Amino acid sequence: MQQIAKTNEQSDVLPCLVIPVQGSRLILPNVTVAEIIAFQRPNESENMPSWVLGQIEWRGTLIPVISYESYCGQKSGVMGQDIRIAVINAPNGDKGALRFFGMVVQGIPSLVKLEEPAIQENLNTSLVKGQKMAVTLETGHAIVPDLDVMEEELLAIDWQ
């Protein structure tokens, strides 16, 4: 949430996407999400962690696709007809081997423009692996996912 875009002299506004996942909502700065695409079944690979669903081709590049729920140690439920893939810009993608990865989401994200008083850290929520911070927005609760750790773990996988 560090990336604040000045829109005028009085306010700092951060355009974000609230992304529905099973049983929760994630919030990410707009610039973190490269694209939301229709779900396509990933090509499965052997010897992958259970949270890695496989790889898809996106804009001529193979990218890994993960289940956020499984990554966090939660049971991944039935994939409904509204599922999509959020293509995420890897945090260190500009200088690393992994530029993008996909995350299965449960519907269409909504755009919100956050001003600092509109978002508060929720210290009453116990965080699990994959969660950097729990926040309370004017529209409810959301989780800031830990994309840096996800990227590190994806880079450690032998894709051969």
Please provide the spans of the model-predicted regions.
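An acidic, low-aromatic, low-complexity terminal/linker signal
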Residues: 1-160
